[in-house]
Design a protein with these regions (language model features):
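Zn-dependent metallo-beta-lactamase
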Residues: 1-70, 223, 230, 248-256
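Short amphipathic alpha-helices and their capping/turn segments at secondary-structure boundaries
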Residues: 33-41, 109-110, 177-189
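Hydrophobic "anchor" residues on beta-strands that sit immediately upstream
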Residues: 44, 118-119, 189, 235
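Metallo-beta-lactamase
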Residues: 52, 71-104, 111, 118-167, 212-232, ...
Length: 256
């Protein structure tokens, strides 16, 4: 995905541009999306589902495709193809956990409608995302998730041994991060959009253009920072193009 950097990192004196204006003097940058597959003795968990292959037509009523084109993505880079490369079928996923229900995280949630996977988001996220008027609200697009049988969590929750969902509102009303405690690699915290990039994390923390509640956002960043300091965790940010290139990514790489 690509977008104006201002969406990710607010700077004074700038305005947000669309892809038709990407050659004007703005920071038009790569905005990677990612999913995380966690394998435990008690089941496989998929964290987020990224963007759909029909992004341009699905997003057309919203105009999101002009601000966040999911271009330069090969067919074999979409979620189902990446899982196939890893030898994992959709019906082998036991839990699909959505950090929040924005279009670039819930875009492939419907892939799992005819499987036995438990579909999970936070209670506050579900309450907002299913009940606003109309088909979309900002980056929430009901076509991605309406009608799915959602189970919800409230508060910080250990969903599997060594896997904790952390409430981190601010970006959305019910945004979550995920903490995974690994025997060899140690603790990893997948912030999702609670923290977009290393530059967002600071300190000091620097907010983004898409923040539902700024006070909650700052509090969530500091909450995550406290957990990192306690656990010496590796932070994996939501959309950090520089960091994603340094991580061990599937299908070749993994963390244990």
């Amino acid at each position: 995905m690509h977008a104006d950097l201002t969406f990710l990192l607010l700077k004074p004196g700038v305005s947000i541009k669309t892809r038709s204006e990407k050659d004007s003097p703005i920071d038009w940058v790569e905005v990677p999306t990612h999913c995380v597959l966690v394998e435990t003795d008690e089941g496989k968990l998929l964290w987020d589902t990224s963007c759909p292959s029909d992004w341009e037509t699905r997003w057309a009523p919203t105009g999101l495709q002009e601000f966040f084109p999911y271009d330069q993505v090969a067919d074999d880079e979409y979620l189902d193809k990446q899982l196939n490369k890893m030898g994992v079928g959709l019906d082998e996923i036991d839990y699909v956990v959505l950090s929040h229900l924005h279009f670039d995280h819930a875009g492939n949630a419907r892939m799992f409608e005819n499987t036995n996977a438990k579909m999970i988001c936070s209670d506050r996220e579900k309450e907002f995302a299913l009940n606003f008027e109309g088909d979309f609200n900002g980056a929430h697009l009901k076509a991605d998730y309406l009608g799915i049988n959602w189970e919800t969590v409230s508060g910080d929750t250990e969903i599997l041994p060594g896997v904790k969902l952390i409430q981190a509102p601010g970006h959305t009303t019910g945004c979550m991060s995920m903490q995974v405690d690994l025997p060899d690699s140690g603790t990893m915290i997948f912030t999702s959009d609670a923290v977009y990039m290393g530059d967002s994390y600071g300190p000091p923390a620097a907010p983004a253009a898409i923040v539902n509640n700024l006070e909650q956002w700052f509090a969530s960043v500091e909450k995550l920072r406290g957990i990192q300091e306690q656990t010496n965790a590796t932070m994996v940010f939501g959309h950090d193009a520089g960091q994603i290139r340094e991580l061990r990514t599937a299908p070749e790489g993994s963390y244990t």
